[in-house]
Amino acid sequence: MGYSYLLSSKASLASFRAAYNVPRDVNITYCHEGDIDLHRHTSLNTVFFPLMAILEGGVRFPVDPLIIGTLRFYGLCPDQLPPNFYLVVSCVSRLNHIFGLQLNHHDINFIYSLCRNIRSNYYLKTRDM
């Protein structure tokens, strides 16, 4: 299942930017997971979000402060997480906006525990209450 067609031409890149509100000053590059380390050393101001985090996880630009705070809290890079992580955090952020709540990464950590899997790096698992 490839998604390179979303970013393969200037027209498809323009429609991707429009559909997901990606600003012009955000550089988009489609690369394989194995090539991320090569691109990481080219710039200190580069952050890698998996394409699926945008497509399925709800990541939008500018990146939500709750996502940034949660990544800092767990000490993780965006490319270490599956789309489900972003979906959970994006839903909590949406609840904050709709109902005027002030939920943060501590509330997420209260409900979910961060687990590690060899294949998918890290993921959130609901805690047994």
Regions found by a protein language model. Give the residues of each.
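Residue-register detector that marks a fixed positional context within folded domains
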Residues: M1-M129
